[in-house]
A protein has these predicted regions:
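A bilobed periplasmic-binding-protein/Venus flytrap-type ligand-binding module shared by bacterial periplasmic
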Residues: 17-18, 88-99, 118
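A ligand-binding cleft/hinge motif common to bilobed small-molecule-binding domains
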Residues: 51, 55-74
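Substrate/cofactor-recognition hotspot
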Residues: 106
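An extracytoplasmic/periplasmic, membrane-proximal ligand-sensing/linker region
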Residues: 127-172
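Extracytoplasmic ligand-binding site segments that recognize negatively charged/polar headgroups
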Residues: 1-54
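Short, hydrophobic alpha-helical packing/hinge segments within bilobed ligand-binding/sensory domains
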Residues: 46-47, 64-65, 103
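Periplasmic-binding protein-like
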Residues: 1-5, 28-33, 39-40, 71-95, 109-132, 139
Length: 172
């Protein structure tokens, strides 16, 4: 999907740039070439198009792929040997909030063993707890994703990507 419209696709592009031993422009140019300058209509369409045979490979979220597999889709997950990112979803309590104690209780609730077990078993998410074992072995090495770098460089990366996908090159 278009990383200019999909946060997960943007993170995947930034992950490739960070983990692959090539210059940024080389990563972008090679990936655009491999895609044939075509992208799925949206993140949700990636697995549909792979399942239907429109594409042989798709980049998507682990949890989404696991849901498709459990629903019977004839696909499998392959993790990049270079590693992949796992950008945390956030939850925080705003200091001085009107209902600060309730907010703290909510955070305690969502990181509790019962909710984290539910997240693993029913939502296909990785737990934030060390004392909960995932249903299946979690595969793929997790790289140290530099979120600060990604935020700082996102606009430039997306501009280069859009130019490449339009056939105008990506700059240097």
């Amino acid at each position: 999907a278009d990383p200019g419209r999909s946060g997960s696709s943007c993170t995947m592009l930034e992950t490739m740039i960070q983990v692959l031993p090539m210059r940024e422009n080389e990563v972008l140019e090679q990936f655009a070439r491999v895609l044939g300058r075509r992208m799925a209509a949206g993140s949700g369409a990636v697995l549909d198009e792979v399942s239907e045979g429109t594409y042989l490979v798709g980049l998507t979220l682990e949890e989404t792929a696991k849901k498709y597999i459990d629903r019977g889709a004839a696909i499998s997950i392959v993790y990049p040997r270079e590693g992949t990112s796992a950008v945390a979803d956030g939850c925080a309590v705003i200091r001085g909030a009107e209902h600060e104690e309730n907010a703290k209780l909510f955070v305690d609730f969502i990181v509790s063993p019962d909710v984290q077990r539910l997240a693993v078993e029913k939502l296909y998410r990785r737990t934030v707890r060390d004392d909960i074992t995932p249903d299946q072995k979690e595969e793929g090495s997790i790289m140290d994703f530099d979120l600060g770098w990604a935020v700082k460089n996102q606009k430039s990366i997306l501009e280069k990507w859009a130019a490449l996908m339009a056939g105008n090159g990506g700059g240097s």
